[in-house]
């Protein structure tokens, strides 16, 4: 259908370009017709008609009425004719626009196919030339390899001839030497024998003769041994020469085999290149045929365009095709939706399994850390704010200083860029939290940083007090938040005012816990139960140098109280030290054991000695990072001391 429309547009465009005056004249005619129709619709008539109707006298009034009626009939017919002419002109105009569009499509298809076929033909010819060049190069290489092969054969033959000649010459020389030695000995002993025969026999001489005979026998034996040794040496030398000759022959045969294999490979390459050149030639012939076929198709398209000028059904067929395409696309969309739902289900299943495995591995890691000791030390790292000489090994939990190569060990080193505060509590910290709740042991989380880190506290409150969590379902949760200081006034952070009395926050040390005389909030509906001043930005950070304590008590919902005995809660303490002065006091009073009996020091000693401890070092300041790193070393030394005491 597209080809017929293109042909239709091609012929119509030629017609329009050859007769541009017709278009302008038709436009002017249309304008004139529109004015005429408007005049007739307004009821206006030509001036000649008006004058003709006004001229007759009163006497001839009857014939004038009949004449006006006939004129009205003629005007209505003229109006109908003009309406028909307008419709015909509109249809002609639409047909011309369709012909122009078809002609444009034909031109685009024609030039596109011809350019594409020419480009493919040029491409195939360039490939053929390239392959022919490769064939010529390979034939030259093959001829050169044949020459090298012939030279090697000649060299091998000449080398074999020289070796055989050397072997024959050595044998001849050895035989001549042995023959000369034998002749000399024979002449010597014949002379001696003649001398002895000429000498008159004597007793001493006879003895000497007998002695000489013995020596002769010994010499014969030695001579026979020498002959045997010479023969053995000759055999060994010949066998060695044969081995050398065989090895030389095998080496040369291997080189010959390699050359023959290369020759065969080159012949195979020539055959493949010839077959590819034949294929390319066939493809070129096919392209030529396709070009001829495309020309025939173009001629057929032109003929179909002529037929399309008479028929007015392409729009219907096109609409049917569009509806079919729409149905096909809708079916594809449904299939894609089904596939997407299946993939989403598969992804959710795999994600759940991965989460289960990660939770299992975290629990296993937590149990291993629990076996090592009661204190944990994690590093929460912001690399962009730290000096460049620190090297971080996240897998092994190690931080190394580049210059001194001093190593600081942690249970975990967590990057802030990959793990946010919310993810830290849900992924890394939750296993420790759940373990302490299940074991019903009081525990703490001590956050140490040289700069304020209020977002960590906010994430902790969300983790503990958010609605519809597992902790809300299993426990009744109470929360207290106070600020303690040795130098300034202490404050109850849940109240909307600050007390002026330094001793306004009273502490009481109990067995394995600390009670706070401050406002207590029961969290049942999530964060809505917290005071407004706690959720707003009135106190984003701690007021001044000191320590912030959040005490959270978990009362089990399913525990049954006997008589007056209340259910025993599990206490959790969040300690926040976010300035250098407080950290130095913490280091002196806890690890270096200096005499510092301040309230903050007593609270920290009580919590570290009677509850499970979790140290979180927030490394986010390049100036005072060494102080926190030394605290990590001291935590590790305290852990080793506790292990020794236990053993």
UniProtKB/Swiss-Prot annotation:
Indicate where this protein resides in the cell.
Cytoplasm, Cytoskeleton, Microtubule organizing center, Spindle pole body; Nucleus; Cytoplasm, Cytoskeleton
* Residue ranges the record marks as coiled coil: 202-350
Q: Sorted alphabetically, which Pfam families does this protein's record hold?
A: Microtub_bd
Which keywords does UniProt give here? Coiled coil, Cytoplasm, Cytoskeleton, Nucleus
- Region annotation Disordered: where it falls in the sequence: 36-55
Alphabetical GO biological process terms: ERAD pathway; microtubule nucleation; microtubule-based process; mitotic sister chromatid cohesion
> MF terms per GO, please?
cytoskeletal anchor activity; microtubule binding
Please give the knockout or disruption phenotype noted for this protein. Short metaphase spindles with splayed microtubules increasing spindle width.
What are the GO cellular component annotations? Answer: cytoplasm; kinesin complex; nucleus; spindle pole body
In what ranges is there compositional bias, type Polar residues?
Answer: 36-51
**What role is this protein assigned?**
Together with the minus end-directed microtubule motor KAR3, plays a role in microtubule organization. Recruits KAR3 to microtubules, and together they may stabilize the polymers. The KAR3-VIK1 heterodimer cross-links anti-parallel microtubules. Targets and/or maintains KAR3 at the spindle pole body during vegetative growth.
Its quaternary organisation is:
Interacts with KAR3; the interaction is direct.
Which protein, by its recorded name, is this?
Spindle pole body-associated protein VIK1
